[in-house]
């Protein structure tokens, strides 16, 4: 049978921010239907100055950076649980780059009071162990900083594939970016408006690979996946081939078919 997979949440959230910075009226097709994405859509379309993201952690991080360069005074809050999630690393980084962000309740936690302004940018050191969403939040607004941005990641990088995803989306919207291992550079400029269709979620595809591997026969067609995907989970095809599931790309469709496993046991890190 044919399965319509959900859209990638990670790509949807990044494209929403970049598209808003581009001030684009062109459509974004196939957005993810999840709390984070829907919160961001609602807030980005709002004319209010007080925003509540609820439980949406990605929205809190990405919108903190986004609002810091939108002229005006903004309040960004969330659920009681969200108010217990630290955001100091991102806020301090933004303030060093020229933002004006303060805490309305507990130091280092939402809710935040944000005075949107023109950001100077420059060079900044960030611990590589922090959430990749902090790094992505900084990168996405970097073209609009007067000096651009250079991020030097200190220590062992985690979630590198999500940083690369952010950079790829930025390139697709016209940003000049570069990365050499732990140093990421973004030149000052602007995003251009482009129509965009979000690819399907490779992590959701894993369940159907598993079904075929267990069944040992049959085939399944999955929609909306790309062979040259920016999602790190797309590399799972190598693992599933060893476990007896072949992957064949046909345009924006992926045909999975059961085959003889190449191994009896898999140890994979």
Predicted regions and their residues:
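Short, structured segments at the rim of ligand-binding sites
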Residues: 1-269
């Amino acid at each position: 049978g044919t399965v319509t997979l959900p859209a990638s949440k990670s790509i949807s959230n990044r494209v929403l921010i970049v598209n808003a910075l581009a001030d684009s009226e062109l459509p974004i097709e196939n957005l993810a239907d999840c709390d984070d994405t829907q919160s961001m859509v609602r807030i980005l379309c709002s004319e209010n100055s007080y925003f509540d993201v609820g439980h949406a952690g990605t929205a809190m991080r990405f919108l903190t950076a986004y609002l810091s360069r939108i002229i005006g005074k903004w309040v960004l809050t969330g659920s009681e649980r969200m108010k217990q999630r630290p955001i100091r690393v991102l806020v301090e980084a933004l303030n060093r780059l020229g933002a004006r962000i303060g805490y309305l309740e507990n130091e280092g936690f939402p809710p935040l009071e944000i005075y949107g302004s023109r950001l100077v940018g420059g060079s900044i050191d960030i611990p590589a162990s922090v959430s990749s969403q902090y790094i992505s939040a900084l990168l996405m607004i970097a073209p609009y900083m007067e000096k651009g941005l250079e991020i030097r990641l200190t220590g062992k990088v985690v979630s590198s594939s999500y940083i690369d995803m952010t950079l790829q989306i930025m390139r697709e919207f016209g940003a000049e970016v570069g990365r050499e291992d732990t140093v990421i550079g973004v030149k000052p400029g602007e995003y251009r408006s482009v129509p965009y269709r979000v690819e399907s979620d490779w992590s959701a595809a894993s369940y159907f690979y598993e079904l075929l591997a267990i069944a040992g026969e049959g085939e399944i067609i999955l929609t909306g996946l790309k062979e040259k995907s920016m999602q790190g989970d797309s590399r799972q095809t190598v693992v599933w081939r060893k476990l007896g599931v072949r992957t064949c790309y046909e345009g924006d469709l992926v045909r999975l078919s059961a085959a003889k496993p190449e191994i009896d046991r898999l140890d994979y890190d």
